Amino acid sequence: MPSLPLSGVPAEHAPGLPPVARRFCRYVRVDTTSDPASDATPSTDRQLDLCRMLVEELREIGLADAEMDATGVVYATVPGTAPDAPVVALAAHVDTSPDAPGAGVRPLVHPAWDGRPFALPGDPAVVFDPATDADLADAVGHDLITSDGTTLLGSDDKAGVAVIVQLAADLLRADAEAQVAGHPPLPRPTLRLLFTPDEEIGRGADPVDLARLGADVAYTLDGSGVDRLNAETFNAAEAVVTVEGVGVHPGYAKDVMVNALRVAAAVVAALPADEAPETTEGPDGYVHPHTLTGEAERATLRVLLRDFTDAGLERRRALVRQAAADAQAAFPGSVVTVEITESYRNMRAHIDAVDPRAVTVALDAARAMGFEMALEPVRGGTDGARLSERGLPTPNVFTGGHRFHSRAEWNTVQNLERALAYTHALVHAWADHGDRRSPPRRP
């Protein structure tokens, strides 16, 4: 098979990039990989490098109250011009997934991509082909942004970070121009900006001080594709299966050794293959054994559990417990224990109970731009799931990216601009539709 052409211009040499794309390419170069094995907050110090950069840039554009707290969470305020409007928070996470390399990201631009397959220069095995990635068909003619193939790109969620900071800069510049021209600024609510570490490992929203944030409604900018709103997530839990075997010299192990790795493998084998991530889609949940560590004497298996319904998640908990019990019975002398912890809940019920305007105003903003927003459940989680559970309704807005958590991750200049334009419309829609004097329902 002939090799594919290599493609990509280093972003720093790509002419004519708009400010939001330049900002995005600058942010993705900062290594912010989080670490699920760390008990620190944040889990990695490298995330603080981008947090400090954000504080500095936010202050430079005029947000004097920009500040990072002791947990790495960054807060800032864009003053509003419609005093009766609700306070709206815009949130994004700074960390990138540990599922793919995140250090040394080199963003490449592929100008006016013609739709023909290509490979990345850092690793020609990373291929972009509409035949294997259907979403690429919508990007023909766009200026693609990728990594060089040796790392992920970091669009999840530095695209959201870039859009929010660029939005703030745009609004403040428009205010200054209106003042010079002697015109009143366009009405908008007060905006609270929020940037969190450790979202990728399920801890992003926990350190957020909701009283300090002071928002009535919020949006995470952490969604894939374009023109999509997520107001429903999985219910999520993680099962930690610990296997105690019996260790002995392998030369004298007959009828004595109980190999913990084989026991753990039996647990994995007992999980239904038709309920795995690679065999499910749409409304289906899944059971995902994602990490196995250990040796013959002791092993630890981590299993992600996901379902859109409470009953479905409980059934998956039972599947893991039964698989563990069966494995222990099949390997006499082994001890298999299961500990299951909840990660986040489906946010739709919390949004509807507290303030359903979080969804309706977002849909109205799209209509004002001339399109219908696709309201889709997200097959994953966001900081918004936990924030919604804590009482702050927080749907998730698109940022243009695709193939998250992989070295084939991509976005486009046009998608970033679309996300920025929509976020402008969303902010101003709250001045038209929201009224803080009419308090939302509380659970």
PLM region descriptions:
Residues L136, H142-S155, R173, H183-P185, ...:
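Midchain, well-structured core segments that form catalytic/ion-binding scaffolds
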